UniProtKB/Swiss-Prot annotation:
It is an enzyme of class 2 (transferase). It comes from Caldanaerobacter subterraneus subsp. tengcongensis (strain DSM 15242 / JCM 11007 / NBRC 100824 / MB4) (Thermoanaerobacter tengcongensis). This is Histidinol-phosphate aminotransferase. It comes from the Bacteria. The keyword GTP-binding does not apply. It catalyses: L-histidinol phosphate + 2-oxoglutarate = 3-(imidazol-4-yl)-2-oxopropyl phosphate + L-glutamate; L-histidine + 2-oxoglutarate = 3-(imidazol-5-yl)pyruvate + L-glutamate.
Length: 351
């Protein structure tokens, strides 16, 4: 009986599943190999003691927004914070998408664009990438003109392919769009190019960011959006009053101030280049160029490779049964030890 009461959009949904097996190295979720910065860890007791857990968190996350504004060279009024960028995608849908509106996004790309579109009852248009997983800008621009979507998502760098779309091409799409264009820059720090300087020039632009990847606090769920003051105001209308807890706000603030980002990002970029170079030497692997902290690889029998990696204690993300990603595994760039262990394991498996 209860199933009959479900909204039609929810019927047939499946839970988001995470592999729950013992592991030596976790390289499946694009997480950083680094723990909290040493100075933050040293002060963690004082940080926790300073938080009054009986009092609700600051609903505006004022201090965190001020620090994020400094980091991004914008003003606090341009910043909206959320419980991970996933929540912000959902809030954008709540604020702007009516049932039957069109949401357009690349395919393959981040799964949450489709999931939240379905929940909103939107009409989904998935624009295929090229066979090599690069953006087909002409195809994308034509789709924006043809379908006149309420929302357009561009993941840059794209997850899970690692491919990017040039700034001038994004601007072209923004100028064609009648709706809002969301540029998801979750992996910005590993790429270095951003649309943030354009948030006041284009009233229909939102840039999404996260502290889960380069800043390494995925477990605290802190994401943020950058846009003009009007869009930020509308997002505040639909968020829950206390959507970001006190501990997340405080530790995020300390991590932003810690000054370790550049060193850690450079480490991951260097490891990424080493990983790509070594993977390309192994017969049976097609490696796609990446501008993020992961590498997408294609195998003749990805399911078997995945199984044998798990047997060796290595978790990678298996996309081989996903339409458009057949035969692929996504590998998170991790510590030097983890990357070397993975390379040696793949040499053994594919020998």
């Amino acid at each position: 009986m209860i199933e009959n009461l479900l909204r039609e959009e929810i019927k047939g949904f499946k839970n988001y599943e995470v592999e729950n097996v013992p592991y030596k190295y976790k390289m499946d979720a694009n997480e950083t190999p680094f723990e909290l910065p040493e100075e933050v860890m040293k002060n963690i007791g004082d940080i926790v003691k300073s938080i009054h857990v009986n009092i609700y968190p600051d609903p505006t996350a004022e201090k965190l927004r001020e620090e994020l504004a400094r980091y991004c060279s914008v003003t606090p009024k341009n910043i909206f914070v959320g419980n991970g960028s996933d929540e912000i995608i959902h809030l954008i849908m709540l604020a702007f998408v009516d049932k039957g509106d069109t949401v357009l996004y690349p395919h393959p790309s981040f799964a949450m664009y489709s999931i939240y579109s379905k929940i909103a009852g939107a009409n989904e248009i998935a624009v295929n990438l090229n066979e090599d997983y690069t953006y087909n800008v002409e195809r994308f621009a034509e789709a924006v003109e043809r379908y006149k979507p309420k929302l357009v998502f561009l993941c840059n760098p794209n997850n899970p392919t690692g491919s990017v779309i040039d700034e001038e091409d994004i601007i072209r799409i923004i100028e064609k769009a009648r709706g809002i264009v969301i540029v998801d820059e979750a992996y910005f720090e590993f790429y270095g190019k951003t649309l943030v300087p354009y948030i006041d020039r284009f009233e229909n632009l939102i840039v999404l960011r996260t502290l889960s990847k380069a800043f390494g606090i995925a477990g605290l769920r802190v994401g943020y959006a950058l846009s003009n003051g009007e869009i930020v105001k509308y997002l505040n209308l639909v968020k829950s009053p206390y959507n970001l807890n006190s501990l997340s706000q405080r530790i995020a603030l300390e991590v932003l101030k810690s000054g370790v980002l550049k060193e850690r990002v450079n480490y991951i970029i260097n490891e990424r280049e080493k990983l790509v170079k070594e993977l390309n030497k192994i017969n049976g692997i097609k490696v796609y160029p990446s501008h993020a902290n992961f590498v997408l690889c294609k195998f003749e029998n990805a399911n078997d490779v995945h199984k044998r990696l798990v047997e060796r204690g290595i978790l990678v993300r298996n996309f081989s049964n996903v339409k458009g990603l057949e035969g692929t595994l996504r590998i998170t760039v991790s510590s030097s030890d983890a990357n070397d262990y993975l390379i040696n394991a793949l040499r053994e498996i594919l020998s």
